Amino acid sequence: MTIMRKTHPLFKIINNSFIDLPTPCNISSWWNFGSLLGVCXVMQILTGLFLAMHYTSDTATAFSSVTHICRDVNYGWLIRYMHANGASMFFICMFIHVGRGIYYGSYMLSETWNIGIILFLTTMATAFVGYVLPWGQMSFWGATVITNLLSAIPYIGTTLVEWIWGGFSVDKATLTRFFAFHFILPFIITAFVLVHLLFLHETGSNNPSGLNSESDKIPFHPYYTIKDLLGVLLLLMVLMIXVLFFPDVLGDPDNYTPANPLNTPAHIKPEWYFLFAYAILRSIPNKLGGVLALILSILILALFPLLNSSKQHGLIYRPITQTIYWIFIANLLILTWIGGQPVEYPFTMIGQIASVSYFSIIVILMPIASMIENDILKLHY
């Protein structure tokens, strides 16, 4: 008798994606972050759903409805902080996932990579509109400052901003529509995730050696289901330590003050996972230039498959590019730090140097290093 999971039209899809999927036998723990992102997305949708049952998207009651969730709803505080810190875990996993893709040359699976970039942008949009919902000071001013950047677009900018706001300032209409966006976007993300997996399973996974693994594959279950389960347990452990002991460590104290359009916070800054892009935005004195740099800081990822000229797959046997890669990671951490600092000397100067370095490393240094390594290979063989 044939096994049902191999013949049933619905179970067959699940079977071919998560059970009998041929997987390279040597993929390391850096490959766990894809499944961890899936777990994060499910957790965010579930906690978000329960929060939405008690939240009201009205400027008069939004802040107090979040307070009500934390004080009066059974385990509301837990759901709220799991959702807030779950977003941080989501981005940590995403940064590592992208970093692993760059290190091991996974960007050569270009369809999967490009869908990944779209996923990254959609997740950033979801997190941004979500941050506005508690209607604290940083929510309000963050929304005002970031949406106002669109006014830099020539000719249609001002009209576009007022259209997004639903008026002449961030107000009731803005909050209501941001709640609607925040509710729908995770489902759009889920659809993109399925497309991401579809393209991945067309080509098969990359692996740490960068070699073809067609001749040496093992079934996904039980080997990688167990491995992923360990990753999930570690993720949940770190998340719950953050939620139960340090729930506000990644938040902003200003967001515990209700939104007040008449009082501007001393330092307006977004959540920590946007700080690198925010630092790049601030490092350019021109408004339109800053907005373009902000967008390019993410879209530049799409250049990786085009700029790759190396004869080897991944950086595992490429010491020069490897060194540049780790300088790039350090530079990204510097940008994140600068994004949270006030706009004054020496932070502005450091931010400008780090911003130029960010683009230079990707567009100039890495391709040059690849060419040098190719020449070294020719000398040896």
Curated annotation (Swiss-Prot):
One of its GO terms (biological process) is mitochondrial electron transport, ubiquinol to cytochrome c. The keyword rRNA-binding does not apply. Keywords: Electron transport, Heme, Iron, Membrane, Metal-binding, Mitochondrion, Mitochondrion inner membrane, Respiratory chain, Transmembrane, Transmembrane helix, Transport, Ubiquinone. Binds 2 heme b groups non-covalently. InterPro entries: Cyt_b/b6_C, Cyt_b/b6_C_sf, Cyt_b/b6_N, Cytb/b6-like_sf, Cytochrome_b, Cytochrome_b_C_euk/bac, Cytochrome_b_N_euk/bac, Di-haem_cyt_TM. A ubiquinone binds at H201. The chain crosses the membrane at residues 33-53, 77-98, 113-133, 178-198, 226-246, 288-308, 320-340, 347-367. GO terms for molecular function: metal ion binding; ubiquinol-cytochrome-c reductase activity. It is found in: Mitochondrion inner membrane. Its cofactor is heme b. GO terms for cellular component: mitochondrial inner membrane; respiratory chain complex III. Heme b b566 binds at H97, H196. It is a multi-pass membrane protein. Heme b b562 binds at H83, H182. Heme 1 (or BL or b562) is low-potential and absorbs at about 562 nm, and heme 2 (or BH or b566) is high-potential and absorbs at about 566 nm. PANTHER family: CYTOCHROME B (PTHR19271:SF16). Belongs to the cytochrome b family. The cytochrome bc1 complex contains 11 subunits: 3 respiratory subunits (MT-CYB, CYC1 and UQCRFS1), 2 core proteins (UQCRC1 and UQCRC2) and 6 low-molecular weight proteins (UQCRH/QCR6, UQCRB/QCR7, UQCRQ/QCR8, UQCR10/QCR9, UQCR11/QCR10 and a cleavage product of UQCRFS1). This cytochrome bc1 complex then forms a dimer. Component of the ubiquinol-cytochrome c reductase complex (complex III or cytochrome b-c1 complex) that is part of the mitochondrial respiratory chain. The b-c1 complex mediates electron transfer from ubiquinol to cytochrome c. Contributes to the generation of a proton gradient across the mitochondrial membrane that is then used for ATP synthesis. This is Cytochrome b. The gene is MT-CYB.
